[in-house]
Amino acid sequence: MLIKLRYPLSLCFIGLLFEASLSYAQAALDSRAAETMPTFTISFDSDILDVAQDGRLLLLLATHDEQEPRFLVNTSAQTQLIFGLNVQKWAAGSELAIDKNAVGFPLKDLSAVTPGTYYVQALLNRYKDYNLSNGITVSLPPDQGEGQRWNRKPGNLYSTPVKIEIKENAANNFSISLDQVIPEIEAPIDSKYIKHITMRSELLSEFWGEDVILGAHVLLPEGFDENPDAQYPLMVFHGHFPADFGGFRTTPPDPTLEPSYSARFDLEGYNIIEQQEAYDLYQAWSGEGFPRFIAIEIQHPTPYYDDSYAVNSASQGPYGDALTYELIPYIEEQFRGIGEGWSRFTYGGSTGGWEAMAVQTFYPDEYNGAFIACPDPIDFRAYLTVNIYDDSNGYFYDSQFQTLPRPGHRDYLGNVHASQYDVNRLEAALGDKGRSGQQYDIWEATFSPMGDDGYPQRLWDKETGVIDKNVAQYWRDNYDLMHIIKRDWATLGPKLEGKLHIYAGDMDNYYLNNAVYLAEDFLEGTSNPYYGGVIEYGDRAEHCWNGDHENSNAISRLRYNTMYLPRIMERIKQSAPEGADLTSWRY
């Protein structure tokens, strides 16, 4: 008994000594980290900007100078460092310190930065006040024609990158001057085939308390001027902010173009492939026998993202109504569109895929078919890897004893490259209150109710991932497309019959195929009516597979404007009402 007793006593004593030594060691590490932790003092001169600023001040550190640090932050394993904090009424000549209080990614804060050589840069993503029609004022980053890209936004201030040395056990204090301003973006130029239009939206201007301009790039059919009596069907290509109408050129690839490598597709000379595909589109578009359509790409950026998701929302306003009832009729009036629901079709991939399905669902009589590629989650039971109704946390699987991170990005072999937490942590560094301009924040800006402060309510806590079930319920009732379709099938089904064409790769990088499986389970079981559409999968295909079983994503992503035309023409043949104009545009 005595022998048995001695060992526990000895182990207890050793344990106490071990805990004490660990505490001492941790304190020593914390002390050294505090001594080594860099601080950065940021300022700008009045000759750069003479008005006090609100916004998000970003500090960027990179271990190499292959590009400026502002272009090296992402969720890949190669990402460099970013730290962000809010500034208010920051005046020229005054100094602001970025220290441990700044939110970091992928490191938590500046105290985790290790000694070494870095290239440092600072950038101010400027905000402005919006006095909303409900009486609330919000401070947000306005789009400046760049599609909510903080590192390229005209008017944002930034510093010239500087090489620094962070030393161990030294006072690492650095001063940075925001000495550059991102210049304005030149507007695209009209050509014979492509026109660029803008219009003031009455609906959105009322919501935002100031003028809101919508835009579109319009690809006109061959023979538009020579056939003044022709009226045309419309194809709406939904997607991210387009600087111009993409993938169309009237000349062969530039013979002097230096081939560039695409890391995404592991292809050398992908820029030449893009130019060839764009020229091929022109040749088909202008060739004999090709259906004469108007095709458009829409510009509808918001202060939250590069596009509005094309639906009405509490925090962004009535974009769905503005696009469907203001912009599209305006385009059809300007360019002789037929202007009837049977003659309008919509398509797109990823964000554009969700938008195509959403506008077809919410405005079923205004469109005659949606071609929905790799859509953002169309069933929130598969919000990527989260069931927002049954799961309790967006970052970790529910487990009593384990901490199992939810994946956020994979390759076609299933290798995980980023977690849900990683992606959201980057957003937290870029901005709070949904102001990062990134993916999860725009989903909340679109799907969530507005909070009392005027900003979107969080689906989950940005730090912990804990899901707010009240917000999840709001998402389900208003934006879960498959929940809405199932709920309203008796009345909605007849209006969607034959109109839904859904495509996804079964190894989509963002697990978006999971929601498509759930959609298929319901749609294939429908009756009175049977949905009568298409659901197809690409074997081992990543994001964003769009239904092409013959070519890789690298090629098929460049062919949206032609690949669905056979099915569109068949749909018109089947569904055009008696007396519809089926001839003036067939020349």
Predicted regions span which residues?
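Contiguous beta-strand segments within globular domains
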Residues: 33-44, 50-57, 213-217
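Bacterial N-terminal signal peptides that target proteins for export
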Residues: 2-11
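Bacterial N-terminal signal peptides
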Residues: 10-20
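N-terminal hydrophobic targeting signals that begin at the initiator methionine
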Residues: 1-2, 569
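Compositionally biased, proline/threonine/alanine/serine-rich low-complexity intrinsically disordered stretches
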Residues: 29-31
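Non-catalytic cap/lid and distal C-terminal segments of serine-dependent acyl enzymes
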Residues: 63-104, 109-587
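Boundary at the C-terminal end of the N-terminal hydrophobic targeting segment
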Residues: 25-27
